[in-house]
């Protein structure tokens, strides 16, 4: 099993054209299980109210259970948008397998592009019935991988480890220069990522193009810093980039041991000083223009080979005036679909240290460490950390506190927004500034993951969806049309209000995160920085 398969059942090679798949192999389902019922209840093609009214049942009938067990056998439809008889007629393998047709569609048919034309035909009526599943993007996020290629050899890189030949693919420049152009007016952040943001041939040209033509947009970059040379530094300085560098260690030796492929440690030891030098050069430019509030975020992936480097890494990050300090746990050493760390001897003490630092530094600089954390780990450790007197923690981390003197999360955030306002850029809330890709939107009486409503994630081969941690179900190639002059264009409203997007919204509104990465903090429908608010950062929202 490939590494990312542990997180979700990702299919890398979605066909650009819609094809009929071979018959599904499945066994008859003699008993109804709760999971099957959930598939029906949370289907955009099921309407319990319509079902009861149409077939004369009382309002107290468990409509999903009835259709799942009995109704489909009687030829009943789950809604006006899905025909039981028609689906079985067009899919004889399903008819012969004694499986509920809507359940089959949910589990198999959707991914196999079955019943596609029929759904597209009724999609306007579906969206009319469920307006909460329709959207018009506003200050959205476009995550764009202009290349999957990278100049590093990180041993835990998902692209390197699982993308096969696609790991070197670059996106057709016409896609981000022309096809994406109509959506830019609805975008607040363009996140340039993939392989390395600064490594593609078109990286500089694209960043310059965006800065000149869409100055209201904040460009966010994810990189190791190796290719972040003078021309990129000047461009980032002038246009207030939000930069993130994965440096992963405090020294070249630890970097080579814990991050880089072990068969090329000599190269790793040469690359690390280049990364640090580029960051320092950029910091000098920022400081000269009183823009240190835009200092890069720095991150580290924690594993067995660098867990004892956390404090030294934090010290280095503070010396480099890091905007935020971000930690991830190496998913190749843990089952991130489980509730607890696979390597607790290494990961658990590391997590406790991060929680202590999070508490000590909360108002000075944010330690962001709650991403890719098995769901059962944080609670007990949090209680331990809460029970420690703050004076004891301040004494324990006296050296780190000294390095953080004068830092203030609130002041730096306000200053960034002052610069953005003067430059005509969209301003950020504090939470959005910390985690532009992981935040919540208000939905009636609660908050919920913003991504299905306001994000597009685009890969070099055209695969796309609303989040890089959601199984891609669309392909840009299927949305390319031609105008009267033969010029290609994309109607982005059709993308954003496609059945796939609407379907995901409907499920997520019902706390059904099927297809999402199992350990995403959004699955709990809580802010990824909620824990920090315990330490008085909540007042920063005012």
Where are the regions a protein language model picked out?
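Radical SAM enzyme [4Fe-4S]-AdoMet core and its adjacent flexible, acidic
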Residues: 145, 166-169, 238-490, 529-532
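Hydrophobic/aromatic residues in well-formed alpha-helices
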Residues: 51, 87, 176, 255, ...
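Processing junctions and N-termini across compartments
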Residues: 99, 144, 148-151, 443, ...
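Charge-rich, low-complexity intrinsically disordered regions
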Residues: 11, 17-125
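Conserved alpha-helical substructure of the radical SAM core
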Residues: 119-242, 253-270, 277, 333-358, ...
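Membrane-proximal basic amphipathic "stem/tether" segments
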Residues: 1-41, 114-133, 406, 412, ...
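Flexible mid-to-C-terminal extensions adjoining Fe-S/redox cofactors in radical SAM and related proteins
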Residues: 122-138, 160, 164, 443-457, ...
């Amino acid at each position: 099993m490939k590494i990312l398969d542990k997180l979700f059942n990702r299919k890398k090679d979605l066909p650009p054209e819609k094809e009929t798949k071979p018959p599904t192999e499945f066994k008859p389902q003699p008993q109804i299980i709760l999971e099957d019922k959930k598939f029906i209840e949370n289907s955009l093609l099921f309407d319990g109210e319509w079902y009861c009214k149409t077939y004369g049942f009382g309002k107290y009938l468990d409509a999903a259970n009835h259709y799942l067990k009995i109704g489909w056998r009687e030829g009943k439809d789950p809604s006006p948008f899905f025909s039981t008889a028609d689906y079985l007629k067009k899919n004889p393998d399903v008819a012969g397998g004694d499986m509920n047709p809507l359940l089959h569609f949910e589990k198999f048919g959707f991914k196999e592009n079955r019943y596609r034309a029929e759904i597209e035909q009724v999609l306007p009526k579906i969206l009319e019935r469920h307006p909460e599943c329709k959207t018009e993007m506003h200050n959205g996020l476009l995550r764009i991988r202009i290349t999957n290629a990278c100049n590093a050899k990180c041993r835990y890189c998902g692209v390197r480890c699982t993308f096969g030949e696609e790991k070197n693919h670059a996106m057709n420049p016409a896609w981000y220069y022309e096809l994406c152009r109509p959506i830019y007016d609805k975008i607040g952040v363009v996140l340039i990522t993939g392989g390395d943001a600064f490594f593609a041939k078109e990286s500089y040209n694209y960043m310059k193009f965006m800065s000149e033509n869409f100055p209201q947009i904040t460009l966010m970059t994810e990189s190791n810093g190796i290719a972040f040379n003078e021309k990129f530094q000047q461009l980032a300085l002038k246009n207030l980039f939000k930069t993130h560098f994965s440096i992963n260690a405090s020294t070249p030796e630890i970097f080579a041991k814990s991050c880089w492929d072990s068969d090329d440690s000599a190269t790793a030891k040469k690359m690390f000083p280049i990364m640090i030098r580029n960051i320092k050069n950029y910091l000098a430019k920022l400081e000269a223009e009183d823009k240190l509030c835009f200092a890069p975020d720095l991150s580290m992936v924690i594993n067995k080979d660098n867990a004892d480097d956390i404090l030294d890494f934090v010290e280095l990050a503070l010396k480099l005036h890091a905007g935020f300090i971000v930690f991830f746990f190496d998913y190749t050493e843990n089952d991130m679909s489980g509730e607890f760390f696979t390597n607790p001897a290494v990961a658990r003490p590391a997590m406790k240290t991060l929680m202590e630092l999070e508490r000590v530094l909360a108002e000075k600089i944010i330690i962001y460490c709650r991403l890719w954390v098995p769901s059962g780990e944080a609670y007990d450790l949090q209680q331990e950390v809460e029970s420690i007197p703050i004076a004891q923690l301040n004494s324990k981390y006296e050296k780190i506190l000294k390095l953080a003197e004068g830092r203030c999360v609130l002041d730096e955030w306000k200053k960034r927004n002052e610069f953005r306002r003067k430059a005509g850029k969209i301003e950020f809330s504090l939470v959005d500034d910390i985690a532009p890709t992981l935040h919540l939107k208000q939905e009636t009486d609660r908050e919920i993951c913003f991504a299905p409503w306001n994000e597009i994630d685009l890969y070099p081969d055209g695969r796309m969806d609303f989040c890089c941690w959601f199984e891609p179900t669309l392909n840009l190639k299927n949305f390319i049309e031609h105008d009267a002059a033969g010029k290609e264009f994309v109607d982005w409203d059709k993308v954003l209000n496609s059945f796939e997007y609407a379907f995901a919204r409907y499920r997520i509104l019902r706390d059904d995160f099927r297809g999402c990465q199992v350990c995403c903090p959004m699955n709990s429908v809580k802010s990824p920085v909620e824990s920090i608010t315990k330490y008085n950062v909540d007042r920063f929202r005012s």
